[in-house]
Amino acid sequence: MMCLIIYLSIFLIIVSRMLTGLPMMDRPDEGGLARRTVGEVEGEFSYRDDVDVADVRNLFIMLPKNGSDIFLFIFDRRSQRQRGTMFLFPKAGFVQPTPAKVRDEAAAAPFGFISPVYPLSSLLFNPYNGRYLTTRHLIAFEVTPESSLHDWYFARSPTTATQTQPLGHITNPPRRSPKDKPTTSGHTDLIIRYCALELDFFQDTRRQRDGIYLPNYEAVWPLAMNFLEGMWIWSNRTLVNVTIGVGFMGFSLTSISYPPLEIIVTPHYTNARMITRFKSSLVLDPPGPSEGPLYKVYVLGYGNNRINGSFYKTMRTIASYPRTKPRLSLPPFHGTYGTALFLSHATPQDMDGTTAYISKISTRLATALFSLSEVRRLSGYVAIDELIDLDFNTRLLANTLLADGMQNFQDPINITYYYNSDVGRTHLRDALDTIDHQHVSHGSLITRARYLQLIYTYTSMEKQSQLSLKLSGDIVKDLYLETLYSDVVRWNTTAKQALFLSSMLIYIAGNIQSSVEQEAINAGRMLFLQCTSMCTTEHASTVRWNPQQILYDLTKSSTRFNIFDGFSPCMASNRYDIISPYGILDLFSAFPISSYRSIEKPAVDSNTHNIIFNLRNLYTFIPELFSCPGVSSNHQRPIAVLPIGINCTYLITRRDPRRGTLYIVDGIDVSNPIIISYLRSGECGIERGIILPGNLNNPENTDQCLYCGCVFMRYKSSGEIVDLLLINDKAVELELVAGENSTISAFNPTKYSSPSSVLLLFPNGTIVTLMAFTSHEVIVFSSNFIWASIGGVFAACLIIYIIIKMLCSFTPDVRYTLLNN
């Protein structure tokens, strides 16, 4: 469809016989465009499509000298200025005295005394002629409801603002503000204070610039506005464009795979104008709900109750997203303003569901930026945590929007802020370069988590890998040890955020080519083991798997919602037997990465697509699973996957995978068997292994960690696997052999009410039934005893020496008597 709005830099020709004064020539209609074809009745508007430029030259000569017609010719951009559309207007429309630009003079305190937004509903700067552009040709693609005014107006959401409830539905805490003039500390202090949950503020120094917003839907007239900032989220297949002005937001979502969507937000007294199929006397705004206390929302998309009804329902839903009152006390951008809705939908299984899914996510991102911009403008400042929160979640959800929602795994995803949007963000990037990373690594869990958030948000993927890999690994290890030694682990938002960010950054580092790629692969395999160990049956029973339940709980609470509240170690694990089928796993599956390697999608059962590290991650971090094409192990739904060594993995399944060294666990319900396969990279043969019964050596009397790297597996005769725990250091090993005296409840058999058995899986492929640990009696002498003994021996020797010396030095007095006769 050619562009028909005259403000789009199109070449146009307006000729009238009155202006040219050329004589009327009686010649045949060589171009086939007779006078009656263009407009036989004086004073009427008509048009003709697909007109050749030669026809225009003919008409130029044919029009009468003092006629009352004016015609306009618009080239089709694809025709190289040879063909286009011609319109014939009555001349009277261009001599009306109505001014072209009329602003609404209504007073509005947040916007000044003159509206910052007003429509340019005119033709050649004359609004009188706008009524002529109401033909079917201009809206043949049916962008809006056309036959029923009931479809034109949307019901307002009960959670948005009204005159009686100007703050709408409250789910966020009060916004903090600077006590004095908003200031920003130095670079280093900026990050340290943020990580320590102390506020810094930026002043709102954005500049306004006059601009014109050109809607993607050409039926809507352009809007004059005061431009502030904007954002693009784009790939080779998709573009999300957000334009922010004073009291104005323009949002558009365009893709080669899905129908377009556009949202326009204006001050509540601004009447946008559009071309419709109704008669010119019925002037309508674009579709949308009624205005709120400050803003009016318009939604444009392809759908109504009769045509594309599912998308029309989506349009009505997202019309309630832009808040109709700037929440100076309750900013909706905290915690991502869009994550609550994001978690309320399972991953769609069809095209209509996917369209609604990505439309809602992208709209939430746009309205979050608009809300922050308005609150920032009205208050004169922005808190650093508000800006970081928005940027972090925008980057996070952009991956879902473009990569997962659009099935666009191969194209890079880009986020571009323009004009005033980079104010403050440059300062944050500079601050990251001055921080002492070693100092942060020794901080508290919340300090390290917020630092990882900054790294993810404001650095490149290459730099992310270098700065975050070791820190991420340490965080995962600390959380794993805490879960081992604590009977009740408090998985609060901080712990979930730290685990999520650590998992995500390790994942990114392993999926890009960098100097630490191999180190990242090793860290990722260890991450799998530790998260699988943390995903016990007891923990899984406490996870809120249902997104709808999470949203329901949110509506009943006044606390701030965070996307991390729905995260769990199970979502970053390779444990598949205790997960729930709800869609929350699908929601988290698309988060971590910004660009993917160009690889073929591994052939894994569709039931495993919804775990955060499956499909893309299993192929990257555990390639030995897919090193034998065509083997059935590539197509099974496993119980668990344990990357236990270098290029070696234990695969636990219910069916024989026909690959690797196979161990069949005895004493298990025949309907629910446990088969353990030890897989090596490139080895596709089959061997039968034997699980060895017996006692193991007690490692208490040695400093060497005999069982580090092994996996402790507790199971029941029913086939249920209770625990899969990694032995990762000497302290955990000693707890393992302590038995009933172990402070780790998973190692203590008295903690289990029903009988269970234990296997120990070694990194070399050996599996042993754990019966007991054999203790050998060893006489141990303390160092004090040894030194005392040495001293005693020395003293005894000294005494003996003295005695001998005395005996040897003694001379007897022997006297002889001469015997005489």
From Swiss-Prot:
Keywords: Fusion of virus membrane with host cell membrane, Fusion of virus membrane with host membrane, Glycoprotein, Host cell membrane, Host endosome, Host membrane, Membrane, Sialic acid, Signal, Transmembrane, Transmembrane helix, Viral envelope protein, Viral penetration into host cytoplasm, Virion, Virus entry into host cell
One GO cellular component term noted in the UniProt record for this chain: viral envelope
Positions on the Intravirion side per record topology: 805-821
Protein's cellular compartments: Virion membrane; Host cell membrane; Host endosome membrane
Membrane-crossing segments per the record: 784-804
Glycosylation site list: 66, 236, 241, 308, 414, 492, 647, 741, 764
Reported modifications of this chain: N-glycosylated, O-glycosylated, and sialylated.
Gene Ontology annotations of biological process type: fusion of virus membrane with host plasma membrane; symbiont entry into host cell
Top-level taxon of the source organism: Viruses
Membrane topology label: Single-pass type I membrane protein
Leader peptide range in chain numbering: 1-20
Ranges per topology, Virion surface: 21-783
Cross-referenced Gene3D superfamilies: 1.20.58.1340, 3.30.500.50, Herpesvirus glycoprotein H, C-terminal domain
Region described as Disordered: 163-186
Keyword Transmembrane helix: yes
Family: Belongs to the herpesviridae glycoprotein H family.
Purpose: The heterodimer glycoprotein H-glycoprotein L is required for the fusion of viral and plasma membranes leading to virus entry into the host cell. Following initial binding to host receptor, membrane fusion is mediated by the fusion machinery composed of gB and the heterodimer gH/gL. May also be involved in the fusion between the virion envelope and the outer nuclear membrane during virion morphogenesis.
HAMAP family xrefs: HSV_GH (MF_04033)
SUBUNIT field: Interacts with glycoprotein L (gL); this interaction is necessary for the correct processing and cell surface expression of gH. The heterodimer gH/gL seems to interact with gB trimers during fusion.
Protein name per its UniProtKB record: Envelope glycoprotein H
Organism of derivation: Feline herpesvirus 1
